[in-house]
């Protein structure tokens, strides 16, 4: 295979969040596959967010820590506590518009659970206030399908940043897979601005 983006090995197909190679038994409870911090660093080189951001599927805090290091005031939440100090236990899909209105205006940056990624995206867009920026780290194949087409017609992403192969790790254990190990799954940052109705721009993030 001649693919300049491929830097992995035979283990790589088992690394990433939601890869089709995972069996149900292999998946962590609540679909926990942590995102390589580099993915957030690359996003922040391209996009600016409001000073207050919400990582609403924070897991062990791999994204939250990078955001905080970059000067953002981060609200970190998840459906269960995975050890990040200060994590708020929140079922994101049960958050209402009223909850948002009664809170600080925050942009959203997260890698949602694979099995309910579409629900996460739709819910974030439905409850957010106008001009809220929402960035979701998703499989590139999120672009496919009739249901997604309807979503994109209603809420077109402003930008999709396609990534060369980045690493995600089961249970947040990046050391298990070795430095430089890639993944068989292509990912992208999908960035929405609530209220945007123009065409989607596709860019390459690295």
Predicted regions located by residue number:
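Class I S-adenosyl-L-methionine-dependent methyltransferase catalytic core
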Residues: 1-206
């Amino acid at each position: 295979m001649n693919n300049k983006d491929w830097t992995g090995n035979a283990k790589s197909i088992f690394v990433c969040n939601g890869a089709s190679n995972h069996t149900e038994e292999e998946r962590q409870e609540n679909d926990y596959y942590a995102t390589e911090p580099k993915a957030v660093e690359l996003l922040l080189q391209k996009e600016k967010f409001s000073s207050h951001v919400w990582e609403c599927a924070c897991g062990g805090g791999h994204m939250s820590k990078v955001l905080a290091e970059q000067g953002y005031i981060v609200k970190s939440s998840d459906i269960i506590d995975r050890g990040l100090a200060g994590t708020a236990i929140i079922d994101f899909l049960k958050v209402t518009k009223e909850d948002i209105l009664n809170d600080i205006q925050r942009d959203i940056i997260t890698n949602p659970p694979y099995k309910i990624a579409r629900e996460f995206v739709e819910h974030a867009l439905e409850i957010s206030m106008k001009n809220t920026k929402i960035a979701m780290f998703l499989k590139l194949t999120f672009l496919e399908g009739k249901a997604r087409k309807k979503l994109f017609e209603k809420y077109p992403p402003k930008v999709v940043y396609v990534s060369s192969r980045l690493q995600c790790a089961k249970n947040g254990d990046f050391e298990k897979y070795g430095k430089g190990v890639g993944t068989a799954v292509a990912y992208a940052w999908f960035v929405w601005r609530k209220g945007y109705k123009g065409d989607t721009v596709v860019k390459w993030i690295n």
